[in-house]
Amino acid sequence: DRFYNGDPENDVETREYFYIGDYSSKVTDWNKYPAAMGVREFYGGDLQGVIDKLDYLQDLGVEVLYFNPLFVSPSNHKYDIQDYDYIDPHFGKIVEDGGELLSPGEKSNKKATKYQKRTTSFANLEASNELFIKLVEELHRRGMKIILDGVFNHCGSFNKWMDRECIYERKKGYAPGAYISRESPYHDYFRFFSDEEKDWPYNGKYDGWWGHDTLPKLNYEESVKLENYILNMGRKWVSPPYNVDGWRLDVAADLGRSNEYNHQFWKKFREVVKNANPDAIILAEHYGDPREWLGGDEWDTVMNYDAFMEPITWFLTGMEKHSDEMREELRGNADNFTRAMTYHMANMMVPSLLTSMNELSNHDHSRFLTRTNHMVGRVAELGPEAANEFVNPAVMREAVAFQMTWIGAPTVYYGDEAGVCGFT
């Protein structure tokens, strides 16, 4: 959303819908700092913007694009997926528009008819998938690859399976969501704390990931249909005509309600993905020892927090990766750095190390350049301007030298190449 706006016609509008206590907001000043709670702010970046800037990315030396989620979702981060089958038209193409924005003071998305039209129209959804195909084809023509973000532990409250916001209620081509009706075909996709006829319609008593009602936890163990659907999504996007080159798996160890089921699912996921595209990579977001998933029958590799981002950050800045803590005794401590790297690298076999995602910054943590200012705190406490103060570009360059030469796949968070700063 904050990369490049190639198609202003698909921009999210102010008051297009209501989410987490406020309206969606269209930002017109690209120099404006994002709000501390900026999940509803949209700068207009889209897939056409990426296509327009592929020469720049290729000249920079980029070989693989890893996207945060692109599927239909109400937030700008899109880890609250509304529809796994389609690219969000606000990133793709809006060919069929209409409906009304919410009036000031109106908070019910039942009346967000413009948002409903944009995100449920099959014309918009199919056109957005077609634009995505065009992007992938152009990347492959250039010898580049693409990785998608798979958010399969939970979905969003806007999701057509739950439909807490009544976006899909009585829409042609869509079945009732589990929030709407106990007879919904998606009822078993979720765990309801109160599951009697009297709790419907509009049953909001369901399990959310970490208690967030905007992130309903998916209930795999009680729904073979759900499991098969998500496995099919894993297969679909790495197969023609989409031909994606791999998946990054969000909070992968959290999926399911037991460790036993988690391993069972990822074995099945690997089988369907590799059968469809043997060269597709499967890498997981994971904190801690990943060995039990890296036996060759589940994940290929991980986002390398333990054996790259954290040791490098402590060694060069003395900061915790969220900027939550400063430990002066770890800055420049070569013995601690060597021990940490040696210990955590030993938890991965060589193939996993060679392909591990070595990042300095990403969407979950403060920017590395900001960590060089040694300020402890987050944007809500310190403000966005403080992220730029007292930074040390020389330390950033030193970190990049490590990143580009260390075993693994150097992965640059967009903006780092231009010296962008920012707190968590």
What role is predicted for each listed range?
Residues D1, L65-F67, I146-L148, W247, ...:
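Hydrophobic faces of well-ordered beta-strands that scaffold small-molecule active sites
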Residues R2, F71, D88-F91, F152, ...:
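Short, flexible loop/turn elements at secondary-structure junctions
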Residues L57, F67, Y84, L139, ...:
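Conserved, mostly hydrophobic/aromatic
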Residues V62, P241-V244, G408-A409:
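A structural motif
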Residues V136, H140-M144, N153-H154, F158-K198, ...:
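Active-site-proximal helices and loops of the catalytic beta/alpha 8
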Residues H212-P216, D250-L255, S352-E389:
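Active-site clefts of carbohydrate-active enzymes
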Residues G295-D306, E359-R378, M404-T424:
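Aromatic/acidic polysaccharide-binding cleft in carbohydrate-active enzymes
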